[in-house]
């Protein structure tokens, strides 16, 4: 086994290179085989860990009883089942406040998230009895759940200036709750 090199899958080639060279007669073939086996087991375990899928709840776990899309309850329920992360949708209101809701116009109403005020939007009662949450209320809840990642979708707005303002306000809010390092913005 002198000069034996363990072949590493390409996905790990930048991280690991294992070579065994028999430099003296003090290392037996049995010892070399054990080292090779240990390295192979380590790499197999690393590959298994790296390949684990991560579950992200879309708009929270809103199909659970007493929940609704993008509600505070949907985030809490998603966190309770151990998801890796939870995705939310964020809009900038007409009075430049950030709210969490999926659709531009709330179903069954004429309330447009971008063209309505915070007061108008937060007066909407969701199917679970909550009101449409502000981003601030949502981030306060996320900050209290340190094991859950946030995937934040900034919704497209009517013009680039409003999108820039929304982005600035989102980053400021994430900083306020120290959540920048565990938030992905899409």
Regions found by a protein language model. Name each.
Residues 1-2, 7, 11-53:
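Bacterial Sec-dependent N-terminal signal peptides
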Residues 50-186:
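Phosphate-group recognition and catalysis centered on beta-loop-alpha active-site segments
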